Amino acid sequence: MLKKFVPSFIVLASSLFSLSAIAQNAQEPAPDNDISASAVLATRPWEFGPFLQGGVGVGDRSDFSFTSAGARLGKVITNQHLPGFIRGQFEYAGELMPYWQSFTPAPHLQETKYEFDGQTGSALLPYNGGTFSGVSITPIILRWDLKPTKKIAPWVQGAGGLIWTNHKYPPDIIVEHGQPGGTSVWNFTPQFGVGFHYFVRPRQSLTFAANAIHISSASLGDRNPGVNASVQFQIGYTWWK
């Protein structure tokens, strides 16, 4: 799976860095004292920009990998509150990913345990697999922007989203069309993440994040094996207004 994931993510990341370089070169260098994360967040600004994301499943989904690309929009809502190292500001944000892919093992036979009439056993059953494409939206991102330094603005966040895929996901036992069974084309994505903005120009920053994402249909399908955990990394470019 990594053979498919790594080249795609490298190409997408290279494209993003090229765009950010063009954006920076289009402006004259600004004095260093104009680049201040704390000054920007003090204005309770809007923030928006593109990002790339990729990662892998863990545990029994370690042979799954993911890539996605999209845009984020957020608004810092409050001034700073709370004491000490947890001092920060509340931000509400959302993300839209028109490109979302998951690479899974190819269709195969898999030993599956079953229970019938009080008896248990196992059998080799056909499983679906391959590449799944879709669209994802994360309309609820609750972010706590921790107190920034001059150039770095860290955060922690909790979020919830939704994925639609072109086939039922994750791959599971193949069932005949029209028959009950299988998973769902709709899945939910509760998640937790950490990250930071690194300010490179006045009101512009590179953005880095790491997210632990759970994928589950909440039993919208007849089966809900889900992806209990995946670790996905994000890189983006952000403008602040």
Which residues does each PLM region occupy?
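Outer-membrane beta-barrel "beta-signal"
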Residues: 71, 227-241
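Transmembrane beta-barrel strands of outer-membrane/channel proteins
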Residues: 46, 50-56, 90-100, 156-162, ...
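Residue-level signature of outer-membrane beta-barrel architecture
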Residues: 54, 75-77, 144-146, 196-198, ...
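Cleavable N-terminal export/targeting peptides
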Residues: 1-40
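Gram-negative (and chloroplast) outer-membrane scaffold detector with strong preference
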Residues: 67-170
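Outer-membrane beta-barrel translocator domains and adjoining extracellular loop/strand segments
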Residues: 60-64, 104-111, 167-177, 218-225
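Short loop/turn motifs that connect adjacent beta-strands in outer-membrane beta-barrel proteins
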Residues: 25, 36-45, 78-90, 147-153, ...
